[in-house]
């Protein structure tokens, strides 16, 4: 009896230790893969060769489209997606901007863009790392910068020649790392469709070919997740920063018909105008442009429409001029015979959600606490 009693006690202790060990075993981190198809218009999913994207949407949730933040440019909108802040609030208000307090000019390719003072808010990779997770970036605006002293655990400097297939392959390589080294948040950026759209147009066969390449790359990542047995813990979020609107050469506003371009600093052209008078006389420039063309709305910085949420930041150009959808604004000297351009005032990506809301939907997928943002969930 004594031996049997001891055996029972010993067995109970073993079971208790096993239960405690199971309770203490850490659950594997969920994985969030944020994918951007730059320039992917709201209707491309239904009319271009994208079977992997359509299959992914059928298994999950899909919005009809997304309303980009103003301005509908690559850097402002991509950073809005990961911070949940409007461009005027996170500070990256355009692809080209100036800041007197920094004493520099920001452009997408300049070394000055790597100064963390340009980048406000807390992007998702910083949030993930603050929670003890690892993050990886296969290109994304801001990931080459030490924001709040943090870069992604793994990141690749932007290089356009790196193909879509190689970008997808790098993502699968990161996912193949051992559990303790594997990133649980990954961004990957594809620009092939955007380039084809600008160069050839929204109905060109080159655009269809680019879409097929991107969809194949998405399929490559999905297959990699499946092969690694990570299906149940991986969430894909596919986004775009803006759409495309066809233009004709008879819908071009030449602002140098009204203003000498040598007297202004032209920060943005085509989709909208961002202008700073070199002599500092904002009122004079405003009077020269306002009401001069029926398809061009002209505003001072603090008078832009409230719906644009594009006020209150000194990096915003003193004069903002927005063409109607389907129009472009440029100069006679700089006109480029492009078949289309992204919209600005009424962008051709329209539907029930905005990129500021994505941050609130992405954070729970990381099991991370929320941070302050401009977004809301419907």
Language-model region placement:
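Bacterial N-terminal signal peptides
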Residues: 8-18
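Boundary at the C-terminal end of the N-terminal hydrophobic targeting segment
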Residues: 21-24, 130
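Loop/turn elements at helix/coil->beta-strand transitions in domains of secreted/extracellular proteins
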Residues: 28-33, 59-63, 131-136, 180-186, ...
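Metal-dependent active-site segment of extracytoplasmic phospho-/sulfohydrolases and closely related
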Residues: 34, 52, 213-255
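Second-shell loop/turn segments in exported
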Residues: 39-44, 66-68, 110-115, 125, ...
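Short, structured active-site-proximal loop/turn typified by the sulfatase FGly-forming signature C/S-X-P-X-R
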Residues: 43-90
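His/Asp/Glu-rich, glycine-adjacent segments
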Residues: 85-201, 205, 330
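Active-site neighborhoods of enzymes that stabilize oxyanions during catalysis
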Residues: 267-378
